[in-house]
Design a protein with these regions (language model features):
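Compact, glycine-rich, soluble single-domain proteins
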Residues: 1-47
Length: 47
């Protein structure tokens, strides 16, 4: 089951089974965005 939910602000929560991915998009300027992925096991990848 895939659940896509938009939180307050520019963050989107994607839930696949028991795995939750939080995608936070922050526009710092033209062409700049920050994506944050958070997994239940505590690994966070920022790009």
């Amino acid at each position: 089951m895939l659940v896509l939910r938009r939180n307050e602000g520019q963050s989107v929560v994607i839930t696949v089974g028991d795995v939750r991915i939080v995608v936070a998009v922050t526009l710092l300027g033209p062409g700049w965005a920050k994506l944050g992925f958070s997994a239940p096991h505590g690994v966070t990848i920022n790009r």
